[in-house]
Amino acid sequence: MAKKSLKILVDEMDDGMDEKLEKIGFEAYSVKKLRAEGLKLHTDFSVINYAKKNNMILITRDTESGEACDENTIPCILLDTNEIFKIVLDKLRQF
């Protein structure tokens, strides 16, 4: 069940996930869309800092961003390539 109190920031590599999360009740924002609105989110540091200042959970594929979040106790979901690979393998086994 979605928790509307969670605020989520989706890194630019997964732009569009914010819209899917919003449809199921999450408050989600896209780095790409926020940048288009004029926010200066051009570096990993600025993205992480924005998430921290706004009490957001960052969703990213960027390993360095994920590690920086961990080091600074900022909530983050790292979409690790190994996890994605496991999903691909599971799907391939269905054929």
Where are these regions (language model features)?
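Acidic, metal-binding active-site segment of PIN/NYN-like and related structure-specific nucleases
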Residues: N55-E71
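Intrinsic disorder
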Residues: Y29-S30, R61
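Acidic, PIN/NYN-like endoribonuclease modules and their adjacent C-terminal/linker elements
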Residues: A2, D11-I24, S30-K33, L39, ...
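Amphipathic, hydrophobic secondary-structure cores in small proteins
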Residues: N49-N54
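Short, hydrophobic beta-strand segments that form beta-sheet elements in well-ordered domains
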Residues: I8-E12, I57-T60
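Short secondary-structure boundary micro-motifs
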Residues: K4, L41, T60-D62
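A general structural motif
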Residues: K3-S5, N55
